[in-house]
Amino acid sequence: MQNSDSGSDSATSVALRTSTSAQAPVVQPVPASQQVQTVQHVYPAQVQYVEGDTVYTNGAIRTAYSYNAETQIYAPSSGSSYFDSQGGGAQVTTVVSSPTAIPSHSMVGITMDVSGSQIISSSGAYLIHGGLENSRHTPSHTSRTFPATLEMAIENLQKNEGITSHKSSLLNSHLQWLLDNYETAEGVSLPRSSLYNHYLRHCQDHKLDPVNAASFGKLIRSVFMGLRTRRLGTRGNSKYHYYGIRLKPDSPLNRIQEDAQYMAIRQQPIHQKQRYRPAQKIDGMGENPANSSQHASPEQSVAAQSQHHQQFIDTSHVFPDFPAPDLGSLLLPEGITMTDIKNLQLMYRRHCEATIDVVMNLQFQYIEKLWQAFWNSKPSSPDGSNPMSSEDEQEPIIPNEKLMVLCKYEPIMRWMRNCDHILYQALVEILIPDVLRPVPSTLTQAIRNFAKSLEGWLTNAMCDFPQQIVHAKVGVVSAFAQTLRRYTSLNHLAQAARAVLQNTSQINQMLSDLNRVDFANVQEQASWVCQCDEGMVQKLEQDFKLTLQQQSSLDQWANWLDNVVTQVLKPHEGSTSFPKAARQFLLKWSFYSSMVIRDLTLRSAASFGSFHLIRLLYDEYMFYLVEHRVAQATGETPIAVMGEFSDFASMSPVQMDKDDVSELGSDTEGDPHISGQPPVKRERVELNHSMQEM
């Protein structure tokens, strides 16, 4: 295209035609139907002509860019601006978006709409004048989050965190893993605990020693500089999220469906999220459900089963707040400050939140890694200091030396034990929200296997810590594991008994056999042991037969048992004797039911098997109801109630001779500080004395 002096003042007709570089065109006859119509584009007086670095225009377009003789990248002088040329006809419009530099991954793009005669620059794209290739300025991403190279990440760690070159070189694989699997993306968020779980899996698969959650946060910020965090979720159940990063589409982690499902929830725009609900469709997992099921990998099969199991747990559970440590008038240990105690509070709370997230996703195998990472935390700097960042999302790190000192401090031991009671009670309510609701046997078995491994995992993770704190924490974990075993057994019994209670012929046979039992003889034998009110026993007998005759469902039987507990324990409400009365009721209930089963056995009752199953279920459910009533009366969690008495039982000489037991009782009665206190408080004082002697 040639420009003439006269062509600048008038409209110019331009014909599009093909040409060769060195030969004259060869003209051949072409049929009329195939002839190319000459296309003319007429540009009005607003067309700009650009030569070199100077832009000339005959329209009244205001200057939007500052000019410098040096080669540079021009940026908009302000936010979004629109400049229209004067005059009618075609229009040239330049759209400038708010960012002030060129993204390193973007090309400068201009799109032309010939029909509309508009030139519009795409969002985030900029017109660059001058020689960019020879410029000493490099494009930079002005978004608050942008990825760094491996060298830049190591340099940031050395500069900002004081990590030596040798230590930073050991983190190369960790940093490279972040670069390979995550990328920046606006409008999405990722929970910190979820990203840390991915990291723990990576370390487990590649036999690497993981860093704790706080140090891992520093690694992330060294790779994704300017990373922001937000606290998302409902009040009392909010969690910190990294805002502006997501899993790469081609990341190997996408092949693991349970992670992809969890990430799909988090990687939606914030206003579209639904907390902890598994996604119905996962990108990259296959479009055809039939083909996906036929060619599913073992990981996908396990993930699909995990997704199915999540409907049976309570993923909306609100994690209660932890109490503050009660230091009383005790002096702090040497070298420990209040800042260290506050850091421990924050660090332990986030550790427990990560545990909750892992259990909610049924990833039980990561609990061991979480415990190992927490109880083997390393100093944040060579001198062991732990400066807190100005950002509220910065994870504090307590060196192992200080953590061991704090674990010997009595108020911290009590505080950590109380926090564990809250944590494990929340986990029980998440995994088994309803002990009578039908649950798949695979989920029940997974929970029982999880309970079986807990004590060993914690003992191994805390092998270097003082025995006082290890014993205290293992005691709570043992109560947690025992509760899971009891509740899963109760659930299994409930499903077996449900079939019996729905069978009319079996119910009729049970009622017939029960009417043959000599309850007067049962009461006569049991009265000497239990000393129960005869009227109460007769009323329970009549109510039991009536409920059985009505062919009540399992839920109706559960309501009846609950009413029995309420009726029996009502006289003791508000009294310090409530826990003791509740335990005595369990013993008496079990003794009476065993006497009835004995009579049915001697009579060779046809429904003996059904009665035996029902008896096991009702005894276990009574235990469940009573422990919750005692917890409610004492203001504790059921885990705390069971843990307290299980610890007391483990410290009590159960297998001792009678003389030793009586000697222990006489010692207790002789203590003036204990003998004058109520039974419940007396037991707690005895427990505290035993704890201090350990």
Swiss-Prot record:
The keyword Nucleus belongs to this UniProt entry's keyword annotation: yes
Biased composition (Polar residues): 289-299
Protein's UniProt keywords contain Transcription regulation: yes
Residue ranges of the annotated DNA-binding region, renumbered to this chain: 174-249
UniProt region (Disordered), positions on chain: 267-310, 658-694
Main localization, broad class: nucleus
Protein name: DNA-binding protein RFX2
